[in-house]
């Protein structure tokens, strides 16, 4: 699929050279490169039979697109989401095979788990003994998105599932060799349809800072106050796994409070960091770039940590390498307006925000705007964009200073609040020159960088 217009193409986010992209898959480290795979349909800017696109990077920022890693064949109608592990000197992909039982009805299907391997991390071979895992009894047709990791000599898999009670759940399996799998437990399941949904997609289970964390994307949650206003959500359960393999945990918490964030995938990097990326769209996103022959992108990689009982996320330190020039290092006055390059980073610190009520800043081109406001009565940060269903809000912990780190990339904005306590991820289809406008309180510290305008190599 050929891109016909560059107007919305991103500068420093991973994209395809054309066609459709959704979930990140197989985030891994192999033979000196970070590898990122993703759900991909190369023949149209619409969802279609799923392939695995593939890119690699030395630094998490500059990506080289590689040949398609997996494609549908006579055995499966789609290669759905999954993960990657290094084993026996090879890079192994673990993915969901999607099988249509009635080509005339996309809702008639079954799913199973499969593996493929590569010696060089580029050319992959599907295992002749696929599938390696079929859905258990007491499960519906929803059985997908395996995330695999290794502990000692044992591989573990967490898998998204729907039980016969039509509630979402995460299943845990183990294997000595990626080929023979046996069940360990139902790691966790939804407490109710309304609160935690009918299906848990893209689960990811790991220990971080002494806590066990289950990331997933539940479907079917109903809005509750400021929470759960996207079509589908992404968030986490934080707790501890017990001796029976079950997660004893707190309530589900959204991990990003913007409109355009779904289907996370993490990697335990060689240096010990837990890194995460996600699809920087959602199934109800407008995706205006489809008019130009492409759709979808991934967020900038983020480093995770647990702090104050929450999962925090910040841009990986490698993002500093895309700074091409410092445009401002000082203060910004109340009421000021500052021009921003279409690929830029702004770091702002407000010292008077806790007692302020109203709009803090506006970011936009005069037609499409993002505004960020604060409500001290509810300790709420409120983000509004000039579209239908434009408001999203999150409660913030008490602070002395409010710090914002804002990444702008032509048709996207990612906002990190107070060192990653809250994030908002947005696709914004700006047409004109961008500016950052402060309202009634100044930024006591302001640093603005221009960022590289092209980090993808196709």
Report the location of each language-model feature:
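Beta-rich accessory regions
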Residues: 232-458
